[in-house]
Amino acid sequence: MFRLSLGVTLVAAAFFANTAFASHDTIKPVAYDSLGKCVKAALSKKDGKIVKLEMKSERKSPTYEFDIEMADGTAWDVECSVKTGKVTEIEEEVAADNEKFKALAKVSEADAKSTALAAHAGEVVEVEYELEPDGKASYEFDILEADHEEVKIEVDATTGKIVETSYEVYQVGQE
């Protein structure tokens, strides 16, 4: 009896292992987890390559931010609510010398940086230049604070006012 049970167990294990390996190539995000929902939602808006994922606390609400590179070379930040799985914001990342960004920017990067650092002292570790969905331009400063927390401060490039503050929880991928 023991041999029969062991034999059946081994056959079943081999079958399920083979099935698991066979489906490994076609793994897709599952809809029941928040990250899977947000990956699907983000790629439905900008179907490119996800090169970075950040989880941040924005207005005390957990948010995923995907950096997506498109085949045409454009780069997008797509934000998705962890709670709802819905896209909440899409911003185009551009170079500092982008013509549209330069035309909209009335505040210098140095002045915007001073504003961000006045609100959150620390070391600026990254600057992004963004075109917002409403047509505005903004600077986004990633600031490493003394307590080693990373805060993101978004400064409107036209008015010089802080429009958004969020804390990074974690990051996966290239800077």
Tell me the role of every PLM-derived stretch.
Residues 2-11, 16-175:
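Long, terminal "pre-/pro-" and other extracytoplasmic accessory regions
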